[in-house]
């Protein structure tokens, strides 16, 4: 523990908080244009073909985003809304596509957790 004299000589250094989603530039979501749509395999214990796409944001950043839900209509040059939040078993993927916003449609025939996938309320 430092003495008062040491603290007067040199103050304590504040720890800077590093952003988990730097490309969003402190915004909740950002708009971007899809550059490439492809599939990737997850890390070791899991096995699947995860749908991802490369997006160029309006601020110039470029990053890989995950497309959640079953089936999608994301195409090259499509305008997408992107939110933060990584995918645990996909290294380098730190963003999610917002389903049901801009050029990305919601998940069809989704009954539960509809708000997360932009699905319309089913007819009673």
Swiss-Prot record:
GO biological process terms on file: translation
Gene3D superfamilies per record: Nucleic acid-binding proteins
PROSITE patterns per record: RIBOSOMAL_S12
Gene Ontology molecular functions: rRNA binding; structural constituent of ribosome; tRNA binding
One Pfam assignment: Ribosom_S12_S23
Keyword Ribonucleoprotein: yes
Assigned GO CC terms: small ribosomal subunit
Residue positions, PTM 3-methylthioaspartic acid: 89
Keywords assigned: Methylation, Ribonucleoprotein, Ribosomal protein, RNA-binding, rRNA-binding, tRNA-binding
Functional summary from the UniProt entry: With S4 and S5 plays an important role in translational accuracy. Interacts with and stabilizes bases of the 16S rRNA that are involved in tRNA selection in the A site and with the mRNA backbone. Located at the interface of the 30S and 50S subunits, it traverses the body of the 30S subunit contacting proteins on the other side and probably holding the rRNA structure together. The combined cluster of proteins S8, S12 and S17 appears to hold together the shoulder and platform of the 30S subunit.
Family annotation (NCBIfam families): rpsL_bact
PANTHER family cross-referenced by the UniProt entry: 30S RIBOSOMAL PROTEIN S12 FAMILY MEMBER
Family, similarity comment: Belongs to the universal ribosomal protein uS12 family.
HAMAP family: Ribosomal_uS12_B (MF_00403_B)
Self-association state and partner proteins as the record states: Part of the 30S ribosomal subunit. Contacts proteins S8 and S17. May interact with IF1 in the 30S initiation complex.
Protein name as it appears in the record: Small ribosomal subunit protein uS12
Gene: rpsL
């Amino acid at each position: 523990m430092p003495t008062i004299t040491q603290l007067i000589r040199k103050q304590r250094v504040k720890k800077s908080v590093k952003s988990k989603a730097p490309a969003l530039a402190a915004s909740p979501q950002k708009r971007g244009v899809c550059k490439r749509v492809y599939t990737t395999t997850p890390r070791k214990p899991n096995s699947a073909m995860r749908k991802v796409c490369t997006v160029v944001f309006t601020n110039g950043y470029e990053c890989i985003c995950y497309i959640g839900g079953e089936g999608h209509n994301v195409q090259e040059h499509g305008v997408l809304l992107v939110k933060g939040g990584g995918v645990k078993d996909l290294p380098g993927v730190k963003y999610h596509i917002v389903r049901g916003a801009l050029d990305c449609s919601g998940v069809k025939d989704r009954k539960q957790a509809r708000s997360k996938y932009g699905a319309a309320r089913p007819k009673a």
